[in-house]
Amino acid sequence: TVIVNGVSKTYAMTGWRIGWLAAPKEVAKAIDSFQSHATSNPASVSQYAALAALNGSEDELIKMRDIFNDRRKFMIERIRRIEGLGCIEPDGAFYIMLVVDKLYGKRFNGRKINGSLDVADMLLEKGVAVVPGIAFGDDECVRLSYAISKEDIAAGLDRIEEFVKEVF
């Protein structure tokens, strides 16, 4: 068993680049050898910040988890009301895969929608930034984030619904 984790999502410390690995000794040695050639050490301030997060109270984590869970539920319920779309409920992180394949073959502003790249480009024209699912090996989806305010989520989903209505 190999376990890899970090502080990015749990402690909202994206960009700090602090992570760890637990593995059998021979596997850990091989990974250490590779890692030492691939990256350098994280800054000491990042290491101390991670240590403080790991040793600190979990009260803020619980609040943050509840806020993200509320946003996730809100987003899923709102997506389910948009005809022609679906979503894959996430098990972790703060992303939802929006299923958009029913839009394929249809047109938006005279252009044919062939895949998730097209949907992402067209949604950007509507002021909504998404990541094409093809980047994750699933061209039937685009990825949405709920690491933003509930108000911004609602506004983005309103724009997505408007886009879908224009397509259908």
Predicted region positions:
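PLP-dependent class I/II
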Residues: 1-168
